[in-house]
Amino acid sequence: GGLAAGISVYLKQLKPEIKIIAVESEESACFKAAKDAGEPTSLSSVGIFADGVAVKLMGSETFRLCNQYVDEIMTVTNDEICGAIKDIFDDTRVIAEPAGAMSVAAIRKYVKQNDIQGKKLGGILCGSNTNFHTLRYVSERCELGEQKEAVFAVKIPERQGAFKQFCECLGGRTITEFNYRYASENEAHIFVGIKLRGGRAEFSEITRDLNGKGYECFDLSDNELAKLHVR
């Protein structure tokens, strides 16, 4: 919260009408917790993806300043952060660290939620403390965060040609990932990623189509455990 405190104090002295929005990761929202409690309060746990902001307890002076000068708090998910990292790279060929990209993630979210047009929005983009191994995680998560991919667990018959038949039921959609798990002589469990063309509305359409053709399937696109450990 030190950056938010310092920036908000400075900007409010220059132009008091500026709206200051603090951004936190949903997994380490210590300012939001302090705001709700009226004083700094320790979180039981924090996520480490955005490790630059993985703080359990907000400092008392930082809280005092942010509480006085910050107008609003927004939280962003890991998927939204990954989408922001991708956008920054696409536009500038610069790779921001997760904590540094949170402001861009929040701007994207704020514009969408409030249908913002013709306004000037600014974000503080800082930090390049990332590593090569993080990039694969970011690449996979941003597709889910931007709703360009859906992930399903599906039961299919354990027989020759069953996967081909399953693919034909997808209506020409591209399969981005496939993991197979033998279950029994009659049944197999598969974990499948499917590229989307129509965003969120397509999730329920795929589920409905597969269920209608006799497949038992579960949408895991928003399942954090699946995103972290099954892929």
What name fits each language-model region?
Residues A101, A105, G123-N129, A226-L228:
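A short, charged, Gly/Pro-tolerant segment at domain boundaries
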Residues G1-Q68, K109-I156:
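Glycine-rich phosphate/pyrophosphate-binding loop at beta-loop-alpha junctions
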Residues A4-A5, S103-V104, F203:
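Short, well-ordered alpha-helical microsegments
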Residues G59-G118:
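Active-site-adjacent helical/loop segments in soluble small-molecule enzymes
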Residues V23-E26, T75-T77, A96-E97, T176-S184, ...:
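Beta-strand->loop->alpha-helix junctions that form or flank phosphate-binding loops
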Residues F132-R231:
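A conserved regulatory-domain signal marking ACT and ACT-like small-molecule sensing domains
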